[in-house]
Amino acid sequence: MKVARANKTDRTVALFSPDLPAKIWLVATGARVRGEYAKSAERRQQIVDAAAEVFSCVGYRKGSLREVANKVGLSQAGVLHHFPSKEHLLEAVLSWRDGQTARLMGDPLPEGVDFLRGLVRAAEHNATTPGLVELHVIVSAEGTSAGHPLRGYFTGRYAAVLGHTRQAFERAAELGQLRRGTDCASAARTLIALMDGLQVQWLLAPDQIDMAGDLRRYLQPLLTVEL
């Protein structure tokens, strides 16, 4: 999969969600918009914020469009004007979360070891948002099912983040910052799998799991520089 690199926003956007609706990304990444477009983007972001709160508190299945609509002073029809279905709204919430992670990583998106450091920072941040972590864990597992409405979203997401992570290891190798003999593709797959697995374990035992610490302990032996 090719990753767009036309400008800073493109490079940041492509990190996790290559097909994210543009208006949500403009708000999530801090890009400037004007006029009616800005008003529409702001309203959509308000809906996404409300949905994130509802879904992370009571779960996606129990969370209703009515509750989301009430939080932003709209009718259900008003919400559906911006998002055609509950599934579309969920995708926007997940994409917005990825946008926040991208901002933590840096703009423009860092390369090499700096990218890996950004993933550790993202893990630290995730420990402050248990509801959103739980939402991601549950929906990403459900999204592996054939025919699930978000299967395509997660397929694209994992392809994008895996590609960037592999490129980070490859760049580190070019700079002599990666231990010789390290398989960059395997290291990237293992790192992403570790991040996902740690989120599940952390949800079950948050007082016993240090997600960022465990990521550092995995990465440091692979590097010739301090993480």
Where are the language model's segments positioned?
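Helix-turn-helix
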Residues: 42-46, 50-92
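Amphipathic alpha-helical packing segments from all-alpha helical-bundle domains
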Residues: 102, 114, 129-131, 148-175, ...
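Hydrophobic alpha-helical segments that form the core
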Residues: 135-137, 182-201, 214-221
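Helix-loop "lid/cap" segments that line or gate small-molecule binding pockets
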Residues: 121-127, 135-145, 217-222
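Short, basic, alpha-helical segments at the C-terminal edge of helix-turn-helix-like DNA-binding modules
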Residues: 95-101
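Hydrophobic alpha-helical connector segments
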Residues: 92, 103-134, 184-191
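N-terminal intrinsically disordered/low-complexity leader segments
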Residues: 1-42
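Hydrophobic alpha-helical bundle segments that form small-molecule/ligand-binding pockets
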Residues: 14, 23-24, 147-148, 159-187, ...
